[in-house]
Amino acid sequence: MDNVRNFAIIAHIDHGKSTLADRLIEECNGLEAREMTNQVLDSMDIERERGITIKAQTVRLNYTANDGNRYCLNLMDTPGHVDFSYEVSRSLAACEGSLLVIDSSQGVEAQTLANVYKAIDNNHEIIVVLNKVDLPASDPERVKLQVEEIIGIGSSESILISAKTGLGIRDVLEAIITKLPAPQGNINAPLQAILVDSWYDPYLGVVILVRVKNGVLKKGMKIVMMSNNAVYQVDNIGIFTPKKVMTSELSAGEVGFITASMRKMADCKVGDTITEEKKPCGEALPGFKEIHPVVFCSIFPNKTDGFKYLREALEKLHLNDTSFTFEAETSNALGYGFRCGFLGMLHLEVIQERLEREFDLDLTATAPSVIYEVTTQSGETLNIHNPNDMPDSVKIKIVEEPWITATIMVPDQYLGEILSLCDERRGKQEDLSYVGNTMTALLKYKLPLSEVVLDFYDRLKSISKGYASLDWEISNYQESQIDKLSFLVNGEPVDALACIVHKSRSEKRGREICARLRDLIPRQQYKIAIQATVGGKIVARETINPYRKDVTAKLYGGDVTRKMKLLEKQKKGKKRLYSVGNVDIPHNAFIQALKIGD
């Protein structure tokens, strides 16, 4: 065990984590030159296209150090986006040390702070790595000062590297050997392993990633899941190099994967402790903090027979990503679908895109919403995230909405516009300070979550030309003036368009959606009325005029009463059509109507 090192790479988005992982794999000959690709650990197409890491990945490397000894390094590459911070927490719990990667041209950013504090909470030894030193804008001395002043870590021994060119990579590997501690554990003790992650493999079935704390995990061993006492027999044991390599056992301090012919996805709960059936350990390891979704939306298949396939796809994805939730629901307008909960808007987009790509589904998603706490006149407290579950306004006593504490780092020249954006989103400023001797402002704001989840991050990046960074965490619930905005098309309610908005925005939002629907719904033979209502009161209306068929075209001259008779007959026909005709709203109309901020 003295020759094992478990470490994670943590950083803000785009500071070069995955590129550094590529260079470490290359240096340790993890893959042959012809097998190397950029972002080799980002296995999903969507990760490579967006240039982001979504799933934390693990890889075992063998490295011969300058002291002549051969070391086994278990590397975890983690995501940097705030939506995927739970992936970072899980990876850190399986390691003893962290490489803190900072872009030497950008400096310390909001997620750098959030992730380094997580590492400190896990008692990690931290090695500071300043990346991109080959860039003309690189300023390592300024960034070293920032690290000491903001984070409070001594940066005199920071390693200067360029993950792109490979400069300084060997120094990083030597620092991992000399500065990071070896894992603690007893090989002779009863088996005690923590379940770090799980996913579905089409060939192997359910695959579980484990970190063995004590004892030895062997092929053929009968294991017990301590959360529910489910018993399974281990079929395969392996490690990632980053290719799958089968092995016969994993001993204390090692990270690897196992398969055990699991049938129930509920049996592989992330954070659970695995032990041996014959010789169980005395107690379970402390698990991970439960994470709860904060953004909800409904997803419906566009094909009538798509519900069954959507359920199967969600179940398989849920195995790979336990952080989102889903439950079946039905809509008058869109049929059968699922109400899903996510950790943020990027998480929602990624899951929807994976469903469409990996499972070839055609989907419609409704407007995102957060969880509101509603206290009724009778004193009952309800948690509402679906607008159609909101009680009538006369039955509501108080509505409370979630607020967050946001940490925003922004260059001084964009500060005014960012402050205006936060105020426009009903924010309350808590603190404004400057980072060390730099021209970077550190803002602390309290903001309603509903104002942040939609397009706040995009607006923040767009105003600051990409330089601002954001990190946030749920703070508390506060009383708020909330309306349920409903829509009627020809007097019929369209439940899929309903949304929950702040009172100050309801009329403006109603007008926007009505205007969009007017342009999106095809014209009919009769007039179509589109109305937005709040508590039974109409706040906005648009009308789609009918096609006009010229029924008098065949007449020439003659008595005017003949013309009047034909027009009267047309009017009666349209009236009859209006009373029985259902307006067919195209699926893309729902998507376009609910788009925000464009």
Swiss-Prot record:
Record keywords: Cell membrane, GTP-binding, Hydrolase, Membrane, Nucleotide-binding, Protein biosynthesis
**InterPro entries, from UniProt?**
EF-4, EFG_II, EFG_III/V, EFG_V-like, EFTu-like_2, G_TR_CS, LepA_C_sf, LepA_CTD
What SUPFAM superfamilies does UniProt report for this protein, alphabetically?
EF-G C-terminal domain-like, P-loop containing nucleoside triphosphate hydrolases, Translation proteins
**Per the UniProt entry, what are the Gene Ontology biological process annotations, in alphabetical order?**
positive regulation of translation
GO CC, any one term = plasma membrane
Q: Which domain of life is it from?
A: Bacteria
Protein name per UniProt: Elongation factor 4
Q: What is its EC number?
A: 3.6.5.n1
Describe the family membership recorded for this protein in Swiss-Prot or TrEMBL. Answer: Belongs to the TRAFAC class translation factor GTPase superfamily. Classic translation factor GTPase family. LepA subfamily.
Gene3D superfamilies for the chain: 3.30.70.240, Elongation factor 4, C-terminal domain, Elongation Factor G (Translational Gtpase), domain 3, P-loop containing nucleotide triphosphate hydrolases, Translation factors
Enzyme class, UniProt record, top EC level: hydrolase
What membrane topology term does the record carry?
A: Peripheral membrane protein
Which reaction equation describes what this protein catalyses? GTP + H2O = GDP + phosphate + H(+)
| CDD domains found in the cross-reference section | EF4_II (cd03699), EF4_III (cd16260), LepA (cd01890), lepA_C (cd03709)
Residues the record lists as binding GTP: 14-19, 131-134
What does the record give as the function of this protein? Required for accurate and efficient protein synthesis under certain stress conditions. May act as a fidelity factor of the translation reaction, by catalyzing a one-codon backward translocation of tRNAs on improperly translocated ribosomes. Back-translocation proceeds from a post-translocation (POST) complex to a pre-translocation (PRE) complex, thus giving elongation factor G a second chance to translocate the tRNAs correctly. Binds to ribosomes in a GTP-dependent manner.
Location in or out of the cell? Cell membrane
